[in-house]
Amino acid sequence: MAVSFLRIPIPSRVFWYPTRLIRVTPALLRFSSSAAFQPSSTSLSPPSSDNFLADKWESYRKKKVVIRIGYVGTDYRGLQIQRDDPSIKTIEGELEVAIYKAGGIRDSNYGDLHKIGWARSSRTDKGVHSLATSISLKMEIPETAWKDDPQGTVLAKCISKHLPENIRVFSVLPSNRRFDPRRECTLRKYSYLLPVDVLGIKNSFTSDEIDYHITDFNEILKEFEGEYPFHNYTQRSRYRRKSEQKIKQRNGRPPREPKSIKASESEFREENHIEIGEEEEEKEVDGESDEHVVTPDSDNSQVYSRAKWLYEPDETDKISGAHFRKVFRCRSGKLENSLGFGFVEISIWGESFMLHQIRKMIGTAVAVKRELLPRDIIRLSLNKFTRIVLPLAPSEVLILRGNSFEVRRLPERPGMEATGESEEVEKEIEEFYRAVMVPQVSIFLDSEKSPWKEWVDHLDRNDGLIDEELEDVRKGWEEWKAAKPWMNLKKTEDDEEALSSVSVPIHQAL
């Protein structure tokens, strides 16, 4: 069996987007999608200051900044702070205290992140890790901030002194007041580390046999590349407009219609972007989907099915532009080894991802490889007329690797120059990845232990589809395809364009 080590983040220089070079400024930060923080009405008292005053800077003024952080999410209940239950450990809870102790938050603002304009790059669930999460806020800064330190590494190290070992601040950069990392992020890059035993690759396999299985798995993963409705890979209701919601009339006149349906859907999609793995009380049991397909029976009772084709519109289960996502890359790397466990690193790059989307993509691909689901299930599931229940893979080996931005062109905001991370920041990220993240993530690469053993056992028992339901879906898909012959030509053209957009060497996106 081939042996190598977990790869460290590749230093970034530039990133080629489909038609242009993405240009980002060091004054803004080159990584992250952001979801605005929801303000809490609960306020906290500042923590005891007995042991940190020597490490606390003196505030000179308040400035909007963007902080890049990395963390191992194993010991935390996700990123987002939980005001209702202070006993719940979160990344933001630790970070807020550390910034306060370093001098970045005033006593009067501590405990209310809304006051300081706190926004995050992702709301990761427990077990999800990151090397490229960004937090933006209006922070109290010292007079010497960024003097001979353009990446803000001195500020970063001061904050990191007050953080546990599994959370690290890499840089603190000044930000334009109008910079919106969520809206201006054009690419998000994730990695998923998958034990090869799950794919059926054994220690006794020859190199040729290993290459065959990985190549075959890549053919399955490539089916996800392109722009499709990924409604079967998330909780659909989270991305659906409320049909009962009424817009109040202004001055006795009906509200203005949006300029276009496309523009309206785009705005809704942006406002409802939920990063992969958002913290919530999971309703899944052992990886089962949390959203069933309901079919009315002849006696008006409800029957739960696992696969269905909608021959008629379902007003209670609409699919809109908010359910569409563009995936630029979904590929597996070669066999690697860490602590004696063989694994492959799956790279998933896209504009944005919905709740559970990546984990369901991985779970479905594994089920296809294990011959529990048919080869055409991915193609069928990416059609807006299908409703299919798909498996959800574990979260413990999902890592946010990086993001890219395209700064919006506004009259008061001139163009930005492209730069990569400084060598000092790259070194800090590499050190954290090797010394902290790798040892802790590697323990989840043992397919004979949790979470993989339970997940695979459940997958093998429960994730097949009823033949009659599947045949009905295929029949509906064939009729739909026959009615739209131009779709085949468009699909070919889209595939060629997508491949050309990622054919150039792509470095770690920041």
Curated annotation (Swiss-Prot):
Q: Which residues form the active site?
A: 125
Q: What is its EC number?
A: 5.4.99.-
SUPFAM superfamilies cross-referenced by the UniProt entry: Pseudouridine synthase
Q: Which reaction does it catalyse?
A: a uridine in tRNA = a pseudouridine in tRNA
Q: Where is this region: Disordered?
A: 235-300
Q: Which UniProt keywords apply?
A: Isomerase, tRNA processing
Mark out the compositionally biased spans (Acidic residues): 277-289
Q: Where in the sequence does UniProt note compositional bias of the Basic and acidic residues kind? A: 254-276
Gene3D superfamilies documented for this protein: Pseudouridine synthase I, catalytic domain, C-terminal subdomain, Pseudouridine synthase I, catalytic domain, N-terminal subdomain
Q: Which residues bind substrate?
A: 190
GO BP terms in the entry: tRNA pseudouridine synthesis
> By its UniProt entry, which InterPro entries does this protein fall under?
PsdUridine_synth_cat_dom_sf, PsdUridine_synth_TruA, PsdUridine_synth_TruA_a/b_dom, PsdUridine_synth_TruA_C, PUS1/PUS2-like, TruA/RsuA/RluB/E/F_N
Q: Name one GO molecular function term.
A: RNA binding
A Pfam family: PseudoU_synth_1
Q: Which family does it belong to?
A: Belongs to the tRNA pseudouridine synthase TruA family.
PANTHER family in the cross-refs: PSEUDOURIDYLATE SYNTHASE, TRNA PSEUDOURIDINE SYNTHASE-RELATED
Q: What is this protein called?
A: Putative tRNA pseudouridine synthase
Give the classification, highest ranks. Eukaryota, Viridiplantae, Streptophyta, Embryophyta, Tracheophyta
